[in-house]
């Protein structure tokens, strides 16, 4: 274990974020990067779309490299912010990658070669002991953030919120020497207005109790090699959702080509969501 990982877990707060998976009526973009249609215009609260579930045979947890993860101390509650896109004048966009099921050497090589700061929203059930892979993936200025223990919907009454949100805080702090500050909820459930006020408050209370300050949504999606954007094309401040799938390396190449044509560059989300 590296010296940085031996630092142990820093105090963290439980973060709960909700992402709903529906199909959005937004413009599609082919892998060539050319917009096919431009229907979506709401940049503050887009229609939820784009989140997939884990395979049904996915394990419910991944063993930590440490025998005794340090507990994350509780901290004072703070208001959880939900972000669909970043308001900035900088010519930047944000690459965010969910789950962790496929550990593609080609995708890792691409982000390393091009020094891409990726924000990894890691599901603990997907790690399968390959902690180093995700550490290397985020080492170009990115970060490893929280996508729950086992990808359960946070709006389901049967989902134990503290376990799904706060337990990864402890594990990732132990493994990576940093407590996540962002949560991306599976399926987007809880991030949109479809969540009941009561459940939203419950999620926010748990998330804020263990260090989460932001529930990060998205307004752009890469899926099966194609792209969709709420604003019709890749734009300044966009948060683009990717998944660790076999098509990831090609999708990263495509979005970087789009960005070059539009005068944009990828930036670390941690630089803009404090």
State the predicted function of each range:
Residues 153-260, 264, 270-274:
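Catalytic domains of cell-wall/extracellular-matrix polysaccharide-remodeling enzymes
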Residues 61-161, 171:
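Active-site beta->alpha N-cap acidic-glycine motif
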Residues 36-42, 48, 52-55, 65, ...:
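C-terminal domain-boundary segment and adjacent tail
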Residues 117, 143, 213-214, 265:
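Residue-level detector of anion-binding/catalytic polar loops
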Residues 18-21:
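C-terminal motif of bacterial Sec signal peptides marking the signal peptidase cleavage site
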Residues 1-14:
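N-terminal export and membrane-targeting signals
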Residues 23-26:
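Bacterial signal peptide processing site
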């Amino acid at each position: 274990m590296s010296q940085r990982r031996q630092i142990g877990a820093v105090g963290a707060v439980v973060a709960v974020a909700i992402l709903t998976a529906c199909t959005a009526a937004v413009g599609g973009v082919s892998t060539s990067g050319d917009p096919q249609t431009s229907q979506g215009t709401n940049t503050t609260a887009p229609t939820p779309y784009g989140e997939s579930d884990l395979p049904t045979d996915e394990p419910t947890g991944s063993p930590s490299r440490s025998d005794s993860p340090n507990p994350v101390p509780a901290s004072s509650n703070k208001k959880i912010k939900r972000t669909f896109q970043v308001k900035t004048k900088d010519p930047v966009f944000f690459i965010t990658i969910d789950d962790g099921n496929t550990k593609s050497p080609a995708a890792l090589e691409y982000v390393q070669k091009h020094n891409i700061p990726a924000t990894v929203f890691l599901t603990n059930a997907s790690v399968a002991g390959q902690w180093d892979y995700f550490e290397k993936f985020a080492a170009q200025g990115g970060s490893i953030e929280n996508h729950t223990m086992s990808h359960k919907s946070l709006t389901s009454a049967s989902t134990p919120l503290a376990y799904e949100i706060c337990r990864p805080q402890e594990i990732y702090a132990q493994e990576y020497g940093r407590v996540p500050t962002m949560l991306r909820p599976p399926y987007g459930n809880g991030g949109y207005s479809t969540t009941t006020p009561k459940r939203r408050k419950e999620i926010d209370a748990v998330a804020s109790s263990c260090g989460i300050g932001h529930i990060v949504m998205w307004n752009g999606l890469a899926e099966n090699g194609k792209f969709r954007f709420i604003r019709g094309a890749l734009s300044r401040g966009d948060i683009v959702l990717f998944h660790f799938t076999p098509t990831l390396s090609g999708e990263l190449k495509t979005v970087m080509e789009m960005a070059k044509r539009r005068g944009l560059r990828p930036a670390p989300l941690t630089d803009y969501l404090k």
